[in-house]
Amino acid sequence: LAVNGAAAVSWPAELPRRGRSPPLEVKVMEKGRHYQQLILLAKDRNPIRTAIVHPVDASSLRAASEAAKAHLISPILVGPEGRIRAAAEQARLDLSPYDIISTEDSHAAAAQAVAMALDHKVDVLMRGALALDELMEFVDMAQGIRGTQRLSHVFVLDVPVLPRPVLVTDAMMHNAPSLAEKRDIIQNAIELSHALGIAAPRVAILSSQETVTPKFPSTVDAAVLCKMAERGQITGALLDGPLAFDTAFSESAAMAKGVVSLVAGQADIFAVPNVEAGSILVKELECLASAQTTDLIIGGRVPVIPVTRAGNMLAHLCSCALALLLVTHRQQALKKSIPA
């Protein structure tokens, strides 16, 4: 159908006025800013004597060198001297500022480094080019290093959407921790939080739900751990649990569920029920929230830096800063405990 004709178009005398749109709120979520703040916090401390165990590759030596340049550690290289110097030549690194303690192999390097820690010659152990299990075998055998509490592993995560770094523990060492082990794991993480300047950290004890039920033993453990904190068996923090991760992570999620909690949405420490849950949580935050991770083994007389992350130098420097902050925190606490 074809239509012929004319149409009259009129233009309004005055254009309609629209209300002014509110300004856009822009939040800049800089990746790594929490790590930078922790490194800055450690800058005013004296570098700590650190045994780099079996640093026979360029990656280990470069990581140690960068941490030394940042005035976080004073490296002592422990391992076969010939292989260490060959790796340094390949990486074009000058080893003249550092002491080298020559050993026959990685086994001897681990034994020597632990002996140095027992003799108070080093404050920290850092893994080089050897398996972590090989190093920890000697740490575990040395009663003077283990101390009264169990050793535990803690991840410190830089999650861009969060206003602070968060700790996840234990996602590496204790596969299915007992109640007593969980107590030590949490207390170790609390001590590290204090060293980072968090006076009263909030601990979320994670499980699959908030209701305590024997069907899920981790919920019962969480409730008991909270009672232990009330009785002074865990000190220096505010605990709540069991909490599902969404409740611990988001205050609005807790409100939607009707969960009243002083920890929800404000957790500094996420205590996971087992290694699998912790590992999954950390990897999810890495993949879905662009989190960066660094870690430390704590609870003993000297902290252990498990991985030299030359591929992510900021995370590696942060692990050295964590060790420095923990060591100096303990030194300050010891001074305060000695009567004047």
Task: Identify the meaning behind each predicted range.
Residues 26-263, 267-340:
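Anion-binding alpha/beta catalytic cores of soluble intermediary-metabolism enzymes, centered on
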